[in-house]
Amino acid sequence: TVTHSLANSNDDTVLKALIDIAENAAKFLRPAIDEVFNLCLQTMQQKDEFEESRRHLALEVLVTLSETASAMVRKVAKKYMNRLVPQLLEMMVDLDDDPEWSIKDTIEDEEDDSNAVVGESSLDRLACALGGKTMLTYILTTVQTMLQNPDWRYRHAGLMAISATGEGCHKEM
């Protein structure tokens, strides 16, 4: 099975193939939508078992599927967004504290493949693809607690999440 292949291999071919299918023939995945979501969410959650790049590919499967078959994903969103959105927000908290930040003349862009950047851009893409009716409840529920956290990284991630989802959720906001 696909799950067995992914779990017992260091090869990302399965996830790359799922991304290609999601881009070019998303309807083909309709009968297996639950399996695809569960596989990708499980991969994303296993930080100790899989490298970041593989977890990012699993996320890309879900985001691409949401962009190319938004109606199909909206139908199952209630089952999975309560797990996916907190995962994205958790990725956005993965920031390094730079003690020299306040004295630098120029601000360096973060790496494009850092968890924080991938999480934020994925949240933006999901909000644009699925809209505020689908996404906003899940985002606000998690962001409210993040904004009250004493750790600056959580507050930063919460504010960035609101900013990132503004375009896709503007009618509901």
Sequence positions of predicted segments:
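Karyopherin-beta/Importin-beta family HEAT-repeat alpha-solenoid scaffold
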Residues: 1-173
